[in-house]
């Protein structure tokens, strides 16, 4: 069995708690309706994708190695903020209510916008000069 660094696990836990709280706060602002676009979930997933792209590129390419930054910010915060499972439940609910176009549009737009967000964040980090 592999040894775990409990400080790294604590970083994931702390980041996950903060990300989950941020998502819950945003979700509380708007109630779900299967006939409308689920903006809270869409927003946190796209923002989370951007942040994962930003943090991953910045931490791997621009900052000194730290064993706690990636678990705290990437796995923890962004993992807690984003919610693929809620997106799936919302899509299924749309399908159950016969909102076929909305379900297809939501799924395709979520995937495309998420990929674009990661790409843009990566380009942004790589465009900024590194101070030495």
Swiss-Prot record:
Segments crossing the lipid bilayer: 9-29, 35-55, 72-89, 100-120
GO cellular-component term (any): plasma membrane
Reaction catalysed by this enzyme: fluoride(in) = fluoride(out)
GO molecular function list: fluoride channel activity; metal ion binding
Regulation of protein activity: Na(+) is not transported, but it plays an essential structural role and its presence is essential for fluoride channel function.
Pfam families linked to this entry: CRCB (PF02537)
Membrane topology annotation: Multi-pass membrane protein
UniProt record, GO biological process: cellular detoxification of fluoride
Chain sites annotated for binding Na(+): 79, 82
Entry keywords, A to Z: Cell membrane, Ion channel, Ion transport, Membrane, Metal-binding, Sodium, Transmembrane, Transmembrane helix, Transport
Main subcellular location of this protein, as a coarse class: membrane
Residue ranges the record marks as coiled coil: none
Localization of this protein: Cell membrane
Lineage: superkingdom: Bacteria
Function: Fluoride-specific ion channel. Important for reducing fluoride concentration in the cell, thus reducing its toxicity.
Family: Belongs to the fluoride channel Fluc/FEX (TC 1.A.43) family.
Listed PANTHER family: FLUORIDE EXPORT PROTEIN 1-RELATED
Name of the featured protein: Fluoride-specific ion channel FluC 1
Organism of provenance: Mycolicibacterium paratuberculosis (strain ATCC BAA-968 / K-10) (Mycobacterium paratuberculosis)
